């Protein structure tokens, strides 16, 4: 699941580009070729969160 990402400067929805980066694993350089606005390019380059590891490891081994 990819959360919606809107450029705060121009208001363009850049969720499809984020989907390509995170889910399809397409390189940032390739994705940015289709993005014309410099504000959107900057947001995609700097504010993409890495995929989170949601596994929880116990801190104490209680036996």
From Swiss-Prot:
Extract the Pfam families matched here: Chordopox_RPO7
MF terms per GO, please? DNA binding; DNA-directed RNA polymerase activity
Q: Superkingdom of the source?
A: Viruses
An annotated GO BP: DNA-templated transcription
E.C. designation(s): 2.7.7.6
Q: Does the keyword Nucleotidyltransferase apply?
A: yes
Its induction note reads: Expressed in the early phase of the viral replicative cycle.
Write out the annotated subcellular location. Answer: Virion
**Enzymatic class:** transferase
The keyword tRNA-binding is annotated on this UniProt entry: no
Q: Where in this chain does the entry annotate a coiled-coil region?
A: none
Q: What keywords are annotated for this sequence in UniProt?
A: DNA-directed RNA polymerase, Early protein, Nucleotidyltransferase, Transcription, Transferase, Virion
Q: Catalysed reaction per UniProt?
A: RNA(n) + a ribonucleoside 5'-triphosphate = RNA(n+1) + diphosphate
Family per record: Belongs to the poxviridae DNA-directed RNA polymerase 7 kDa subunit family.
Function comment: Part of the DNA-dependent RNA polymerase which catalyzes the transcription of viral DNA into RNA using the four ribonucleoside triphosphates as substrates. Responsible for the transcription of early, intermediate and late genes. DNA-dependent RNA polymerase associates with the early transcription factor (ETF) thereby allowing the early genes transcription. Late transcription, and probably also intermediate transcription, require newly synthesized RNA polymerase.
Q: How does it assemble?
A: The DNA-dependent RNA polymerase used for intermediate and late genes expression consists of eight subunits 147 kDa, 133 kDa, 35 kDa, 30 kDa, 22 kDa, 19 kDa, 18 kDa and 7 kDa totalling more than 500 kDa in mass. The same holoenzyme, with the addition of the transcription-specificity factor RAP94, is used for early gene expression.
State the name under which the record lists this protein: DNA-directed RNA polymerase 7 kDa subunit
